[in-house]
């Protein structure tokens, strides 16, 4: 809030561009280029040619001294509900009329509003939660989540989550994402 107030003293709202740090990554930005600068994809990017979509955010590190944070957040809130949902929206959205931030935002909101809502019995069929255990990463030993600093020894906080979602629109009807 303080940063917003400081920025608004110098710039008007239309001159301020807020972006999630994850969305600023080159790979994420390239999704829009891949989708909309290559017209060949438009006729193929739909339920008639795509059986399913998988979006991964893989990491080779653990929580890296963020035990207190992760114990209250977990992977679902840390990664899925913001970063990965935005990626899903970029992958599934319709072509924006322009690449203006407001227009892209409006198209991503349409996707998110089209996500099929789960009923209670849908959750066990469509959600997997897990934790990483001790092992190796890049040839080096790593501890499991329960052995990380500031993590409760009986914690059930997820460090891995997988969701199967559906977007109820003409393009993605019946395609699991």
Enumerate the predicted regions with their spans.
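Secretory/organelle targeting and membrane-embedding segments
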Residues: 2-177
